[in-house]
Amino acid sequence: MEARGLACESSNSAVKAPSIEDFVLVKPISRGAFGKVYLARKKCNSKLYAIKVVKKAEMVDKNMTEQMRAERDALALSKSPFIVHLFYSLQTATKVYLVMEYLIGGDVKSLLHIYGYFDEDMSLKYISEVALALDYLHRHSIIHRDLKPDNMLISNEGHIKLTDFGLSKVKLDRELNLMDILTTPSLVKPTKDYFRTPGQVLSLISSLGLNTPVIEGKRHSSTVLGSPMSCGKVKQRNRSLGSPLMKRRAEYMNSPVCTSRALASNSVFSPVLLARSLTPRLLKSGKRLDTMSVGSTHSCMLPSTTDSENCVSPMWEDEQNLHDVENIPQLNGREVDNRKSRNVPLTPVEKRKTLPARAQDHRPVFTPLNNQVTNSRNIKPDLSAKRLQFGATDNSATPLEKTVPHQSVGNGLIKPEPLKELKSSVKRAFEEVEKSPEQAEILFKKNDAAYERSFQIPEKTSRAHTGLTGIFSIVGLDDVKSAPKCQQFNERTGPKQSSPIAVAKNLFCELEDQGEEGGKAEPNSSSSTSPGDERNIRRSLSLESDVSAHEMSLVANTPQKLSDAKQEVLSSSFEELDENEISAVTPMARPTVATPKHSSAKQRRGECERSLLDHPHGLSDSMIKSPGFLKPKNVVAFRSYCSSINRSCTSHLSLASFDAMEMSASASFHNAVTPVQKKRPSLSNSLYQTPQQMVVSHTPYRTPKSVRRGPERVEGAPILGTPDYLAPELLLGKPHDFMVDWWALGVCLFEFLTGVPPFNDETPQLVFQNILNRDIPWPDGEEELTLNSRNAIEILLTMDTLKRAGLKELKDHPFFDGVDWENLHHQTMPFIPQPDNETDTSYFEARNTAQHLTVSGFSL
């Protein structure tokens, strides 16, 4: 088979490298948190493969690009009989394809649903093989971090192979190279089972291309939540074709700037002129991305939205380009150049030939343009009421004509000067900016001194981006019993302008009404608590908050979905998933810690009216204990310990980095209350806190280390895993290592023997409490576990990581007596798949059915 694969590849190697076009799709297999898995066949032979398809845009939006690389690297480096083999890592402009071996036996979770639970011998063999796989990974500096029955596949012979390394951690601070693939330390002389063709090796060491211009724009807009220029850009991208320019022209015709109405709208919007204006801009987009100063202040405040595929105009286009190249009317009502408005547009070939000549004409046109801009601002100072870009400037602002000679027209270097020109080029109208009062303060800044203080955000601006509150006004919060606190909050704060406080006031009134309509069965949900009790609550909750699932993605797509603040935007995200699919994702949504990274503790102590955004959420002790606080939505797919066989379906989807889950998933879990942190005043009256991040960061909602409890967290260690299988050190905010996998193995052993995870409960909060309290419901009576099996579980589920068992301790344990560790892959397995044919995927259907997952779609 391998010889045929090599011959097939060698015959085409002179033509092209391996491509996804070399495969033919057979059928879908399953669906996970980040993509779908398909059964496919290679065109040149009959060998079957399992292809995992992941969209690049989704990984960028979820801040999971590093995890995508980690999964590919972990599979490429692993050459073990107990780990799924990766053949190819292919990609297109929008998707990544991991071509792996197809294991026809399905996953252990499906088998567990069918069996109910495994007997002791069956559990012993499965756990032994998984233990060897974990030991192999740990010796190669790979932490799986998502070990669960769902990610254990059964081969044709019935053996176990680990898969789904999407949450793994690989200690490889560089790109894979040829030697990493060919010389795995444990296999100096690789056997033919791990032989890779040249095309396979080439695909495995290639870059995943997650930093393309299209994706880069999305990366900035997803992470720079606090940037005043990033809000509302979704509209510009959705309407793509020069949207800010088209709006500007239309508003210009209706504004006082246009003293004469001589120019007809069709003379500006003609298709000929539109095509003429876009061509040179697109030619420049690639060069601009290559030369932009990444470390500059303005790169952070004004991230690139250049998207060559969507024809989005760059935010830093200079004044001359917008008026000369695009033939936009001057601010005083005159045309830029009557000759150019009458010229016949050039073809793309002619434009490229004449481009140097056009570039030489930039400077002569620049000076009169700036004079016109300056004069128009002096003549009409009252335009701030109509348009943001013509607002009043600082008296110390440098005139534009003084900065023009320093502007480099031919390149894309970003300097402070172009920001001044920006105000009269592509700024949107006042009524188009959702958060106008807050953004106006930054938009009016014109001098260098103002931008030297760019990270010291004004008070109103820091409260402008409301993150979560916009979501809760759309998603029903039936169980929120906080109407008195909301009413008190509204009475204390009431600015008349369109500010975040007013917005929050309206939103909390809606929550108040919904809370009253949702029932009054929880009289204990009072808001009167002594300061001492609140400190205890904050302490207990902060222990569960930091490095656990609490840093989930309640804010994953916030900049894109909340910029419009319309129900249509969010409702469309829910329409993509039916109720069953939402129920499969919902258990991943959990409380978040969403405090800004660059705010000090002193800044967080403020007036009571600032509690909506700057303070965490105070919760009374009775509220935490009340059934209403812990009551899940109907779609939350958690089962009780005493329910039927399907009760253990809580572990179905891998929880991504909890800074990066989809908004639809997190919004569907309405009980997500943010835990209270240390060093916070007790006068916080809001139940939800909105992040106010203002700088580019891969983890923008990370709590400042100054308020963390426990040891300082290791750098670059996001919170990953599935609720039932999370180790306590993750919930306690401590640095974690490979011992988290051994904890998860103990959870799996308990689940194999009983049919349900040991810490399973109705809500994620209760699951976390069970883990931290090590509350294990041991079966009794006829279902009681043997002493050896129970002790094996206990040494794996040890709270102290230094005392937790590993492979060495398991080999010496009485429960594993008689296990031939050196020949596990030759032992007879208790279950051997008997498929109807080679394309049979029925062994995967049990888990899909139990978790209400529907797999559809046949497009790669």
From Swiss-Prot:
One of its GO terms (molecular function) is protein serine kinase activity. The modification Phosphothreonine is found at T722. The active site is at D146. Pfam families: Pkinase. It is an enzyme of class 2 (transferase). Residues 23-816 form the Protein kinase domain. Phosphorylation at Thr-722 by CDK1 during M phase activates its kinase activity. Maximum phosphorylation occurs in prometaphase. The keyword Transmembrane does not apply. ATP binds at I29, S30, R31, G32, A33, F34, G35, K36, V37, K52. One of its GO terms (biological process) is intracellular signal transduction. InterPro entries: AGC-kinase_C (IPR000961), Kinase-like_dom_sf (IPR011009), Prot_kinase_dom (IPR000719), Ser/Thr_kinase_AS (IPR008271), Ser_Thr_kinase_AGC (IPR050236). It is found in: Cytoplasm, Cytoskeleton, Microtubule organizing center, Centrosome; Nucleus; Cleavage furrow. Its EC number is 2.7.11.1. GO terms for cellular component: centrosome; cleavage furrow; cytoplasm; nucleus. Disruption phenotype: Morpholino knockdown of the protein results in reduced number of circulating thrombocytes, distinguishable at 3 days post fertilization. It catalyses: L-seryl-[protein] + ATP = O-phospho-L-seryl-[protein] + ADP + H(+); L-threonyl-[protein] + ATP = O-phospho-L-threonyl-[protein] + ADP + H(+). Residues 514-537 are annotated as: Disordered. Residues 817-860 form the AGC-kinase C-terminal domain. Serine/threonine kinase that plays a key role in M phase by acting as a regulator of mitosis entry and maintenance. Acts by promoting the inactivation of protein phosphatase 2A (PP2A) during M phase: does not directly inhibit PP2A but acts by mediating phosphorylation and subsequent activation of arpp19 and ensa at 'Ser-62' and 'Ser-74', respectively. ARPP19 and ENSA are phosphatase inhibitors that specifically inhibit the ppp2r2d (PR55-delta) subunit of PP2A. Inactivation of PP2A during M phase is essential to keep cyclin-B1-CDK1 activity high. Belongs to the protein kinase superfamily. AGC Ser/Thr protein kinase family. This is Serine/threonine-protein kinase greatwall. The lineage of its organism: Eukaryota, Metazoa, Chordata, Craniata, Vertebrata.
